[in-house]
């Protein structure tokens, strides 16, 4: 292998020049130390509060868990704590499927999930204004109203109000309100029960109801619910007005 001899003088000269430059720079910087402004204080650490820890939820569910009707993601603020806790556990344990939710809660303990549920349940925030108009056909809205307020005895479908409260704002401790939710969210969840893609604690009453509904029924009730105004008091009622029409594992 041929050896190539590198010239020595330019290297030595370059090295001396580099060292000289470093010396000048070092001396110059040393002389300027006293003229530098005081170093800014280190920023405070991220506060370890529940508000900070649930910040990731806001990216999808909106400010403090309050979304508008145009969004796909459901509102969290003011929902019954028992309901939120059950849903978080279902995402963690695989009964509900959503890639982001499954990933975020997969290592969380029951105690931590309960803390998150309690936080969002305790938020008292106004609901976004609901547009009273719908592009759904009148017959579809009429069918949705029937299912929500009366049910369909011929198919053994109980009315939504029998479980979710007369005002459809939910019932403590674990039944959610159905108003103020995006139409697409409601229809997608009912559709997931219809196709056996969403599950809850046994006995899974909503899975039974979902399987008794047609896709037309699902679209009808979701469309009707989406345009209903919020009542003066949008909070969940303290207890059911009458015994539930069927057993639900989420209430145990």
Give the residues covered by each predicted segment.
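Bacterial N-terminal signal peptides
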Residues: 18-34
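Tandem-repeat/low-complexity and Cys-motif detector
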Residues: 74-77, 106-107, 177-178, 212
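N-terminal secretory signal peptides that target proteins for export/translocation
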Residues: 1-15
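The feature marks the first
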Residues: 45-94, 98
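Extended intrinsically disordered, low-complexity coil regions enriched in Ser, Thr, Gly, Ala
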Residues: 80-102, 180-204, 239
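Flexible coil segments in periplasmic/lumen-exposed cytochrome c-class electron-transfer proteins
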Residues: 41-54, 63-66, 99-169, 195-252
